[in-house]
From Swiss-Prot:
The gene is p1. The keyword Nuclease does not apply. CDD domains: Trefoil (cd00111). GO terms for cellular component: extracellular space. Its main location: secreted. This is Putative gastrointestinal growth factor xP1. GO terms for biological process: maintenance of gastrointestinal epithelium. PANTHER family: GASTROINTESTINAL GROWTH FACTOR XP4-RELATED, INTESTINAL TREFOIL FACTOR-RELATED. It comes from Xenopus laevis (African clawed frog). InterPro entries: P_trefoil_chordata, P_trefoil_CS, P_trefoil_dom, P_trefoil_dom_sf. May act as a growth factor. One of its GO terms (molecular function) is growth factor activity.
Length: 78
């Protein structure tokens, strides 16, 4: 009986940690479409997409000679 409870708690913790990135919601495509010259580096050389998004940043490795991990575009306040 205790083993079943332990397994359920472990599964809940794993699913919960996978579903959240340090409380950061995923950014929209618009927020992460930042021009090459306007990108402000948010990571380090060799950072993985997972590490980058965990830091609350955008990751895009399709543009050469630009930071791949960078701060998202600020959202306008209404």
């Amino acid at each position: 009986m205790n083993y079943k409870v332990f397994c359920l708690v472990a599964i809940a913790l794993i699913v919960g940690s996978i579903g959240s990135a340090n409380g950061q919601a995923a950014f929209t495509e618009e927020q992460c479409s930042v021009e090459r010259l306007a990108r402000v580096n948010c990571g380090y050389s060799g950072i993985t997409p997972q590490e980058c998004t965990k830091q609350g940043c955008c990751f895009d490795s399709t543009i050469q000679d630009a930071p791949w991990c960078f701060y998202p575009r600020a959202t306008p306040e209404y």
